[in-house]
Amino acid sequence: MQTEHVILLNAQGVPTGTLEKYAAHTADTLLHLAFSSWLFNAKGQLLVTRRALSKKAWPGVWTNSVCGHPQLGESNEEAVIRRCRYELGVEITPPESIYPDFRYRATDPNGIVENEVCPVFAARTTSALQINDDEVMDYQWCDLADVLRGIDATPWAFSPWMVMQATNREARKRLSAFTQLK
């Protein structure tokens, strides 16, 4: 398991310090910087992952491909690439911003709060997956249209950040562009 921190933010999104990642996520989680990424394969299918049961927040929940926290001195794009390698063992194309101003707060059934400024990215995989079981307990390659129908019909079956991202009209449009074969 990687030791990481989160970059704390004030209400205007300005960095104010750091805190160890595990300690940062509590019932009173402070606002911090994160990222979320949606990955597509060469067939235009979306990678949906199920969070490992050892995760502190939303264990066992289906979500978009990979999420994480940039480290000090690291761009969001560099953080996406790092976490894709760590969680999924996969190489990707340069991440593209699809929802740059996404911000949310949500509480999981155990009372753990996510409180994040969380730019959203999409990319294509360029290598085979090598799943890290400490991070991901299951995964599926799915047609984006099927996933979006599932989110619309049963939002409770997915992470709240995935649902909020997928219900944003502009983000949906940008995600749909990744289903086109290149």
Curated annotation (Swiss-Prot):
One GO term (biological process): isoprenoid biosynthetic process
Subcellular location: Cytoplasm
Taxonomic source organism: Escherichia coli O6:H1 (strain CFT073 / ATCC 700928 / UPEC)
Described function: Catalyzes the 1,3-allylic rearrangement of the homoallylic substrate isopentenyl (IPP) to its highly electrophilic allylic isomer, dimethylallyl diphosphate (DMAPP).
Family as reported in the entry's similarity comment: Belongs to the IPP isomerase type 1 family.
Subunit structure: Homodimer.
The gene coding this protein: idi
Cofactor: how and how many bound: Binds 1 Mg(2+) ion per subunit. The magnesium ion binds only when substrate is bound.
Alphabetical keyword list: Cytoplasm, Isomerase, Isoprene biosynthesis, Magnesium, Manganese, Metal-binding
CDD domains, per database record: NUDIX_IPP_Isomerase
Pfam family, one: NUDIX
HAMAP family: Idi
Residue ranges of every copy of the Nudix hydrolase domain listed in the record: 30-164
Metal-binding keyword on record: yes
Cofactor(s) it depends on: Mg(2+); Mn(2+)
Source species taxonomy: Bacteria, Pseudomonadati, Pseudomonadota, Gammaproteobacteria, Enterobacterales
Name assigned to this protein: Isopentenyl-diphosphate Delta-isomerase
A GO cellular component entry from the record: cytoplasm
Top EC category: isomerase
Catalysed reaction, written as an equation: isopentenyl diphosphate = dimethylallyl diphosphate
Record-annotated active site: C67, E116
